[in-house]
């Protein structure tokens, strides 16, 4: 039993390394001039940018009409360019610093009409090299409250799903991801189907297939991803839910 535990731990660690390597590979391609990948990367991490902006300014951010959010987006883009992959720093902690510094620059040039909490200028948010080497580099921990993440983690475990499974089972094509999000939302909003999911620990495939008018194989092939997204829709992970709502649009609208 102990050997099996160690093997499982090693496997998860190895998969973590694979995910991290993929993340770094994406950053390298962006820094080498892949503009489409850069746009997709920034779009994917808008919830993180929104969270940093909201925390920094101490207020709700309307992404459709916010100078601060526009500045934060620009700062995140700047962080991509300035990030030194070879130093092994945590990209998200690094980009958070860049965003906060640009927001501070903006606030100082607009003192007359902007008010920010004192914590906005605290040094505790500017990390030393040791903290920047942290490997909490990717996933929900970057955008949501830890207790809500732990609650989701427990529910996923009931289905034999980990956060790593979620990362590894993301459909490659945007239209496939959008379809899975719609299926997950449909499953989450239908009490009868959701109760069946929680009771049987499996998607009520026939009911969902009939309601969504999709092939059963589509549901089966994306089972883990759909279940995870459904649980997110039923959770307190509000930023993640808003992002999923945004992702089902045409990609031209902003977060709502």
Curated annotation (Swiss-Prot):
Record keywords, A-Z: Cytoplasm, DNA-binding, Sigma factor, Transcription, Transcription regulation
Stretches assigned to coiled coil: none
Location in or out of the cell: Cytoplasm
SUPFAM superfamilies: Sigma2 domain of RNA polymerase sigma factors
Protein activity control: Negatively regulated by the anti-sigma-I factor RsgI1. Binding of the polysaccharide substrate to RsgI1 may lead to the release and activation of SigI1.
Keyword DNA-binding listed: yes
BP terms from Gene Ontology: DNA-templated transcription initiation
Factors inducing expression: Up-regulated in the presence of cellulose.
Domain of life where this protein originates: Bacteria
Gene Ontology CC terms: cytoplasm
Cross-referenced InterPro entries: RNA_pol_sigma-I, RNA_pol_sigma_r2
GO molecular function term, any single one: DNA binding
Position of sequence motif Polymerase core binding: 67-80
Ranges annotated as DNA-binding: 205-224
Similarity annotation: Belongs to the sigma-70 factor family. SigI subfamily.
Function: Sigma factors are initiation factors that promote the attachment of RNA polymerase to specific initiation sites and are then released. This sigma factor is involved in regulation of cellulosomal genes via an external polysaccharide-sensing mechanism. SigI1 promotes transcription from sigI1 and celS promoters.
NCBIfam families registered for this protein in UniProt: PRK08311.2-1 (NF006173), spore_sigI (TIGR02895)
Subunit structure, interactors included: Interacts with RsgI1.
UniProt name for this protein: RNA polymerase sigma factor SigI1
Designated gene of the protein: sigI1
């Amino acid at each position: 039993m102990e050997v099996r535990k160690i093997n499982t731990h090693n496997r998860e660690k190895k998969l973590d390394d694979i995910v991290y390597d993929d993340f770094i590979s994406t950053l390298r391609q962006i820094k080498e001039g892949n503009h489409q990948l850069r746009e997709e990367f920034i779009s994917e991490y808008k919830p993180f940018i929104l969270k940093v902006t909201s925390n920094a300014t101490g207020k709700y951010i309307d992404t459709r009409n916010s100078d601060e959010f526009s500045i934060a987006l620009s700062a995140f883009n700047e962080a991509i360019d300035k990030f030194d992959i070879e130093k092994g720093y945590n990209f998200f902690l690094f980009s958070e610093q860049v965003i906060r510094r640009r927001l501070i620059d903006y606030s100082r040039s607009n003192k007359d009409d902007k008010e920010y909490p004192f914590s906005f200028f605290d040094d505790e948010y500017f990390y030393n090299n040791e903290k920047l080497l942290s490997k909490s580099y990717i996933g929900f921990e970057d955008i949501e409250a830890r207790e809500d993440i732990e609650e989701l983690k427990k529910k996923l475990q009931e289905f034999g799903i980990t956060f790593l499974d979620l990362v590894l089972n993301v459909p490659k094509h945007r239209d496939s991801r959008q379809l899975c999000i719609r299926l997950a939302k449909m499953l989450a909003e239908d009490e009868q189907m959701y109760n069946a999911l929680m009771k049987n620990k499996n998607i009520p495939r026939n009911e969902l297939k009939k309601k969504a008018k999709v092939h059963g194989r589509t549901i089966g092939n994306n089972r883990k991803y759909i279940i995870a997204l459904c649980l997110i829709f039923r959770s307190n992970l509000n930023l993640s839910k808003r992002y999923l709502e945004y992702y089902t649009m045409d990609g031209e609208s902003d977060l709502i």
